[in-house]
Amino acid sequence: MGDIAKIHITPETPARPTILNPFESPNDYHRLHESVVPSPSVFKSCKSSSATPAKFKWSIDEMANLLPVEIDPEDIHRQAVFFSQARADSEIEEKRQHAIEQFFTKGAIVPSPWGPLTSKQSMKLPHHKSPLSPLVTEEIQPPKKINAICQTVLSLPVDFNLEKVLGDYYKTEELTEQVQESLSSSSLRRKLFLDGHDSGSESSTPSSPDRNSPSVHPSSRELMSSAIVSPLQCGIPTGTPMSGQFSSSPIQGQCRAYSLGSVTSPMFSERSSPAFKSPILSPIRLQQSVTPESGERKRLSFLSPNCVPKGSSDINMNRSGESPLVEGCSPIRSCSPFQSRPRNRACMWASPAHISPILHPVLHDKENIHITQHLPTMDLDATSTDPHAQQDSLHAESSESEASVAVSEQMEQDELFVKDTGENVETNGKECESDNEDEGENELGEEESCAWVPEEDTASPVRLSSTGTGSVPNAESTHMFLSLLAEGSITPYDTSMQVDSGYNTHSVCTTSLMDTLSSDSQSKEMLDTHTSEESGPFTRHTKPKLFVPPH
């Protein structure tokens, strides 16, 4: 029994530091904001390595036993009274309060149940549900309402009438009245706007061809509102198109328009009333011709100076066998930009192809008309098989000798037109008409019936002469020269245009703007024109020929 070693519990060594209360020491305020919850390793038994023995230090009890000190009880009482009445330093106390505030505001141990919601969302784990973690749930539960009572600065009774106290400062009637007033004003403006469009012009909706167009009174056609794009369009009669709808296509009514004005605007409607007419941009108003035979109303014509509209629709045109499209040296039409006048059974400026007697099938009963003067320069596409055109070709061959004589005279006249296009227009027109007097009075009578009659206005130039007889004043070539100014160079030189329509061959002297043609191409085309002269009259497509006339 004596061999059994007894277990001795060794007392606490003096070298181990004693655990003191942090609130007792005034120097422990820097650790007050830390959490009080101890670490789990505090309860673990750990053996400290005592390789180097700590410095020996006597404890207070041992020192009291070894070195007793006589303490006066009066001093103890006085010290107790001092600590009870005296406070710590104000700076240390302020630091303590700040540390306590930081601990309870930022490092809260238990959050409030009715505080702000946490940003963490519950994770959805369908395989299992952990009872230890409340954040891991199988499905999202709806938030629960928690009734909490707290004391506020302002305490209100249960039966407190908030509207009675704050009703004078919060009025919803004023806001409602303002909204109602704004709505009424906007509805009034909308109503006026809609009434104005309903009563007059329905410009918001484009017109369709199947509307009741014949029911409109013919007098209302003169009140159509149109936008004058160019001052040169003043006085051009608007034709009645064959289609009932505006078209933005460059090909309008068998007339190709290479102008920006071919795109029509849907803002101008068919039924625009006089009260809603657009302002006329030019002091010269647009003259419009009314066609009683046409059942459709007039459509607007947005043109440029190089795109002349069709005239009156009372002319019987055989459109099945002709192609009035211009295929020439310029994308701009070679038409004269000057104004035309409406007339009965007269020439129609649908396209430059109608100027030629070959392609104009209007004069069916005039078979004794001969070509005595040359046509203006333009490129024709003749695919017609009209018998009258073939008869005209036979007369044209007999007048080739006279055409060659008039070449030199017209070349001199063209030079005068380039210098002065004002007064010389009428004089040159008279000279050209005097050359045609030796053809007979019958021919002159037919020429007057198909000629453009000039008015009293001296500013307006001479109109194009007969399309049936082929006599054209040299002013037309000058007009075409002016209409082609957009192409660049205006330096004229005398050339001769060979127009081969398949039925006849006659040279036309005009002022050409083809500056880029070389001498090789001119000589080749001259050979082609001689071969076309020797060939008999047969139907084929028109090819423009340009060669230098022999001097």
UniProtKB/Swiss-Prot annotation:
Biased composition (Basic and acidic residues): 416-433, 522-533
Keywords of this entry: Cell cycle, Cell division, Mitosis
Matching InterPro entries: Aurora_borealis_protein (IPR023252)
Polar residues compositional bias, start-end: 382-393, 463-474
Gene Ontology biological process terms from the UniProt entry: cell division; regulation of mitotic nuclear division; regulation of mitotic spindle organization; regulation of protein localization
Biased composition (Acidic residues): 434-458
Composition bias, Low complexity: 201-215
Disulfide bonds: none
Molecular functions (GO terms): protein kinase binding
Positions of region (Disordered): 194-221, 379-474, 517-551
Signal peptide extent: none
GO cellular component: cytoplasm; nucleus
Family to which the UniProt record says this protein belongs: Belongs to the BORA family.
Cited function: Required for the activation of aurka at the onset of mitosis.
UniProt protein name: Protein aurora borealis
Record organism: Danio rerio
Encoding gene (name): bora
